[in-house]
């Protein structure tokens, strides 16, 4: 039986500190709902991508994403830039 609980993962990318985006939060069920609520409170763009969140959820907290995930995460960062008109690490 497939687990139908909501899942969420959050990334942070600080170019001056990180060589790649990092997982800063992940969870299922109530924890996922809290992650999404906090993101909404802070006007952080949300993207619904169940396959990507599944892969990100397998990573350890604060782990940088592996190189084979760069393309998928670059698409997320491009989405965030389009929504916020702000490039990560810029003022």
Q: Where on the chain are the PLM-derived regions?
A:
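Divalent-cation
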Residues: 1-91
């Amino acid at each position: 039986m497939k687990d139908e609980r909501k899942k969420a993962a959050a990334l942070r990318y600080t170019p001056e500190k990180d060589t790649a985006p990092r997982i800063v939060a992940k969870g299922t069920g109530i924890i996922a709902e809290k992650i999404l609520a906090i993101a909404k409170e802070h006007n952080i763009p949300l993207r619904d991508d169940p396959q990507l969140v599944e892969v990100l959820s397998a990573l350890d907290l604060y782990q940088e994403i592996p190189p084979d995930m760069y393309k998928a995460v670059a698409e997320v960062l491009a989405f965030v830039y389009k929504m916020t008109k702000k490039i990560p690490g810029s003022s």
